[in-house]
């Protein structure tokens, strides 16, 4: 057969039909060059040298495996959306050269994903940024309600992707033509992601020519999920769901909230965790399954446990205690009788350091009285008294005259000035008691009840303290629309979770000194429990409203206005507090990421460029 066409010249142009003149010309040219072409494949129109048969067979097997990596299988449900991402301008010339054709197919399947399209411009407002393990994602402050994001469909996981049963005419193409999602002129531009072009799945569809000739089975899609694209889709899905909630479009919100776990599963690290907590909070709000306040012994004990782990895992509470103690220590300079009122004593972890500093003071320690305020316990145990006993034992070991009183109050607004005065009558011959009031992450809870903050500040004024220390989250989660609050909290807690991830490798200063083999495991437990601690705050900010929403964080500027209107003025924190706080952070893993800044006499601690908590000190304004 080869000799019969020996005199024919030229080469095949691309036909695949048996018996065509172009096929004959191709086979003849190969024979004329002395190459042994497989006659069976040549009869079908494909030029394969006998010496290349093993290589071609191996490449075909690799191609079959690559096309099977999309998780498709028999009996799978159709998903026509995959075909819409294919381009129409990628042509593989000379498909009769089967070896080169298969090799080009493999290179296309293994090609890197196309560049991301620009995120949709949802409005003209300035966008913020959420950091994640995969990069930085822009957060538009609002989402257009007409956005096609409400039609968001999930990206199937490799184990759960489905094969289309009935492909449209668009899906069944000439097997010698392959489309990719990389061209701006392709049909995928008109059917990009439901995020308005913000993210796309990369889809490749192809079938080997021999298989296409022998079997008319439609080609199966291969899905390559890019985590950065999925991250952008995840952020926009969260924001679109929040806007649907704000507009009371519950059907759209319900559809979107079901997509968030699918998108979050493609992420890693902090982004996946924070998205899971926000997705849960949105689901609770959409389905009206609000978190109940701690009303059992187990819940109260668990909340205390989470607080203790958060203290150990990251420097935020340590920074709050250290800077507040430094301001109180300077205010108590030269005083012989001092009294501290702690609005949220918890386990009393703040005060051993202050007692120790007072014990080392030149001239000896003063007489120290501590009033600790805490909520009632569900089992009516006196947890406050147990904290007092531990502190009294510590004070005894360092020879500090110590007195303690615990005050049980459901809310700080229940306090009256007489409760904070010394028991019994003071000796007129003794030096008057100098009072300091301390509040760490407590003031913002008062904003849930109208007039409660003003009542508490009036009580504080009545006892005439020398100094009032206030530590609060540096965030605005208490004003604007629900979508504004949601966007701000998503930004804030994404940064907080990033800082936990960044500081998880080496733990806190206690691990450096102990050198225990169990330190890495303990650090991992602290981080997980700290994430749960923050997750509860997220749930309260997003899922709750009215008096139930107690996590009403405000910025330092807002607190400055509130305290100024109540008759207080700022006490500048000294340079010693700044220097020693910076030294403290150097002991933590990820210390390079933590930043201490001085802001109008106050100190803030943040992660990289984002402040997260702020310490301020106040005194009664002059007449």
Curated annotation (Swiss-Prot):
Residues 1-27, 109-138, 159-201 are annotated as: Disordered. Residues 307-372 are annotated as: VHIID. Keywords: Gibberellin signaling pathway, Nucleus, Phosphoprotein, Repressor, Transcription, Transcription regulation, Ubl conjugation. Residues 111-120 have a biased composition (Pro residues). A motif (DELLA motif) lies at residues 38-42. This gene, also known as the 'green revolution gene' has been introduced by conventional breeding procedures into several cultivars. It produces shorter plants, increase grain yield at the expense of straw biomass, and are more resistant to damage by wind and rain. These wheats are short because they respond abnormally to GA. The keyword Lipid biosynthesis does not apply. Residues 543-619 are annotated as: SAW. GO terms for biological process: gibberellic acid mediated signaling pathway; regulation of DNA-templated transcription. Residues 386-425 are annotated as: Leucine repeat II (LRII). Residues 225-619 form the GRAS domain. Its main location: nucleus. Residues 435-540 are annotated as: PFYRE. Residues 232-288 are annotated as: Leucine repeat I (LRI). Belongs to the GRAS family. DELLA subfamily. The DELLA motif is required for its GA-induced degradation. This is DELLA protein RHT-1. The lineage of its organism: Eukaryota, Viridiplantae, Streptophyta, Embryophyta, Tracheophyta. The gene is RHT1.
């Amino acid at each position: 057969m080869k000799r019969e066409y020996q005199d024919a010249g030229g080469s095949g142009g691309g036909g695949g039909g048996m018996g065509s003149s172009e096929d004959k010309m191709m086979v003849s040219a190969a024979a004329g060059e002395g190459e042994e072409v497989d006659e069976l494949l040549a009869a079908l129109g494909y030029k394969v040298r006998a010496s290349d048969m093993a290589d071609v067979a191996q490449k075909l097997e690799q191609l079959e495996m690559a096309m099977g990596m999309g998780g498709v299988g028999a009996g799978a449900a159709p998903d026509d959306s995959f075909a819409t991402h294919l381009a129409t301008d990628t042509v593989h010339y000379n498909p009769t050269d089967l070896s080169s054709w298969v090799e080009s197919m493999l290179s296309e399947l293994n090609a890197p994903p196309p560049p991301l399209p620009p995120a949709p411009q949802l409005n003209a407002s300035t966008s913020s940024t959420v950091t994640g393990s995969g990069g930085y994602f822009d957060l538009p402050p609002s989402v257009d309600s007409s956005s096609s994001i409400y039609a968001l469909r999930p990206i199937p996981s490799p184990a759960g992707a489905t094969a289309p049963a009935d492909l449209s005419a668009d899906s069944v193409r000439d097997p010698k033509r392959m489309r990719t999602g990389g061209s701006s002129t392709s049909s995928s531009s008109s059917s990009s992601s439901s995020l308005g072009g913000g993210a796309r799945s990369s889809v490749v569809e192809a079938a080997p020519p021999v298989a296409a000739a022998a079997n008319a089975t439609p080609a199966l899609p291969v899905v390559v999920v890019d985590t950065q694209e999925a991250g952008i889709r995840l952020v926009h899905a969260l924001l679109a769901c929040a806007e649907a909630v704000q507009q009371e479009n519950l059907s759209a919100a319900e559809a979107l909230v079901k997509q968030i776990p699918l998108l979050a599963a493609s992420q890693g690290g902090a982004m996946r965790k924070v998205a899971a907590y926000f997705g849960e909070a949105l689901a609770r709000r959409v389905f009206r399954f609000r978190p109940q306040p701690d009303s059992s012994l187990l819940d109260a004990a668990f909340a205390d446990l989470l607080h203790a782990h958060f203290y150990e895992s990251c420097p935020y509470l340590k920074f709050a205690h250290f800077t507040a103690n430094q301001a109180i220590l300077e205010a108590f300079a030269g005083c012989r009788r001092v009294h501290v009122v702690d609005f949220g004593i918890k386990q009393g972890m703040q005060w051993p350091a202050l007692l120790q500093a007072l014990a080392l003071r030149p001239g000896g320690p003063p007489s120290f009285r501590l009033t600790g305020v805490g909520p009632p316990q569900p089992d009516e145990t006196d947890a406050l008294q147990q904290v007092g006993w531990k502190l009294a034992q510590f004070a005894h070991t360092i020879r500090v005259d110590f007195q303690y009183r615990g005050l049980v109050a459901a809310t700080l607004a229940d306090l009256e000035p007489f409760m904070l005065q010394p028991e019994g009558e003071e000796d007129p011959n003794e030096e008057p008691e100098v009072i300091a009031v301390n509040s760490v992450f407590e003031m913002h809870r008062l904003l849930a009840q109208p007039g409660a903050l003003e009542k508490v500040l009036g009580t504080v004024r009545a006892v005439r303290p020398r100094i009032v220390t206030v530590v609060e989250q540096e965030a605005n989660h208490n004003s604007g629309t629900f979508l504004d609050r949601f966007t701000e909290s998503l930004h804030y807690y994404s940064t907080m979770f990033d800082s936990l991830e960044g500081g998880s490798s080496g733990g806190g200063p206690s691990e450096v000194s102990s050198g225990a083999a169990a330190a890495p495991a303990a650090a991992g437990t602290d981080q997980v429990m700290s994430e749960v601690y923050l997750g509860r705050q997220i749930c309260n900010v997003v899922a709750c409203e009215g008096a139930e929403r107690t996590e009403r964080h405000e910025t330092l500027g807002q607190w400055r206005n509130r305290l100024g209107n109540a008759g207080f003025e700022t006490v500048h924190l000294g340079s010693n507090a700044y220097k020693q706080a910076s030294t403290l952070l150097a002991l933590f893993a990820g210390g390079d990421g933590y930043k201490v800044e001085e802001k109008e006499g106050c100190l803030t601690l943040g992660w990289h460029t984002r402040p997260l908590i702020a310490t301020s000190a106040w005194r009664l304004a002059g007449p």
